[in-house]
């Protein structure tokens, strides 16, 4: 019997199904081939990465970096344990050689020349011959800029972080930011409660208007002034995080030795809601993630703007700040690491006592190689982040220029030195008081009318004081205090100092 001819293969439905099946088989074959090719590519890339990772450098030692001039600058990285590492530089014939330790880490100190640009550093493996070249290296002046939000505050208004409202005249300042001999590094914000990290996110970039407007306003303006005054390359290492306590910036081992830190450890212990809401405020959190990774990078000095977050327990600030400075100097391997810090700007809700605690460290000589600039006259009663960043940056620069570079500029405002009583008046003598004057509300230089000035008798009841500058000294009195015994200036939470010297620098707050 003859079977009927099967017409199914010729039916449109069957033909479509057959084609789809063949297409599916074809696609699967192509997929497997592509998958295998991708696997091989990934394997090749992994091998390449592994090979290149035999010499690993921290983010701060990279293209566009700036090395401190005329010193022994520290370089470091990682390789295989026991591996020989060689370093060559474009400015010298010497080959620096060292061996990695058991953990694979190595470090060397390279002698740097006077300021120059367009240099390179080559790091080579003695085992594999692999060489990593760091290009466009500058040799000049390197400064750290660290602290909390007023140091972090960017030049341009920020859409996401709305507290960054932008500095005054930011467009004009950004337009004057095209400086190929200023390079900027920013440690990306991070924290860690448990692990002390050895690297961080960040890169060196050449200063331009686009870069500068998204960088710390104070740090950039400080760098620009140094560059113009010194005519040398300048590098800034920005390490700042808003809302952080001083304790966030100190090593855990240091704080565990002193009971003064018990309160903050108790307040930020694991499991507490505050640690989830404000993880960056925890003790050592910023040290672990942001400071330790750049530890030892050779710098000329540090400018520091922080204390707002410590203001509500101001009585502890002086010893904590002393611990911070001493530990940074010791850990950095730079015993004379200059620290120039800002006396924080007045703000309506910020306890003014913290400014006096800051002043104790400097005025009482509790640390060497430090200096305090002040923002006592540029605060904002409604905003803890004043828009005037030109003035603080300039005052930081004056300290650096005067103390580190020998420039004959005044860096210090009038500083109370002596108080005497003459009848119903107190006579105040100041250091750094050449050309002492009062700036009135109309912006005129006058000899009377100091703001936020008070006197008291032995009863301690302070009354607003009248004042007059006579012979370079400030005479102070009040009709309500016939026998004055105490005097204070600019100690309120919000105030605006108006007593200046000829350099335009304001007098520091005081209580006597």
Model features per residue range: what roles?
Residues 1-56:
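Bacterial Sec-dependent N-terminal signal peptides
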Residues 54-512:
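Cell-envelope and extracellular/periplasmic
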